[in-house]
Swiss-Prot record:
This is GTP cyclohydrolase-2. It is an enzyme of class 3 (hydrolase). Belongs to the GTP cyclohydrolase II family. One of its GO terms (molecular function) is GTP cyclohydrolase II activity. Binds 1 zinc ion per subunit. It comes from Sulfurospirillum multivorans (Dehalospirillum multivorans). Gene3D superfamilies: GTP cyclohydrolase II. Its EC number is 3.5.4.25. Its cofactor is Zn(2+). Catalyzes the conversion of GTP to 2,5-diamino-6-ribosylamino-4(3H)-pyrimidinone 5'-phosphate (DARP), formate and pyrophosphate.
Length: 141
């Protein structure tokens, strides 16, 4: 899970991050597993820039356009450290709870036995954000 202070801690309705984290924690409490929490706030543009991106979204830019307006790629995150962490714990196969195909493709030496989708209903504040993630970033929503 990539850090999202506004969603994870403050309950922002602009994204589904806090609900995704809660969904993952509930499933892990029932079935076992672990969360790897990555310090990549705002798709790795940082909290200050994320707040500026939110302001641009309020002006009508979508989440990708807002990042581009600030001089960033649509997604600045990387996931290579996940493989290192899993290897440290001698984990070579996983069931991955994600909607993000980029997370699956970065795990070169880890066998993904199964991908479990994270099903979170949209709300009036994040419906366009989720649509952009699906249509422009390839998220499996």
């Amino acid at each position: 899970h990539s850090e999202c202070l506004t969603g994870d801690a403050l309950g922002s309705l602009k994204c589904d991050c806090g609900e995704q984290l809660e969904f993952a924690l509930q499933n892990i409490s029932l079935l076992g597993g672990m969360i790897i929490y990555l310090r990549q706030e705002g798709r790795n543009i940082g909290l200050f820039n994320k707040v500026n991106a939110y302001a641009l979204q309020d002006q009508g830019f979508d989440t990708i356009e807002a990042n581009h307006q600030l001089g960033f790629k649509s997604d600045e995150r990387s996931y290579e450290v996940v493989e290192t962490i899993l290897e440290h714990f001698k984990i070579d196969k996983i069931r991955l709870l994600t909607n993000n195909p980029k997370k699956m493709s970065c795990l070169k030496n880890i066998m993904i036995i199964e991908r479990w989708p994270i099903i979170i209903p949209s709300n009036n504040h994040n419906v366009d954000y989720l649509k952009t993630k699906k249509e422009m970033m390839g998220h499996l929503l």
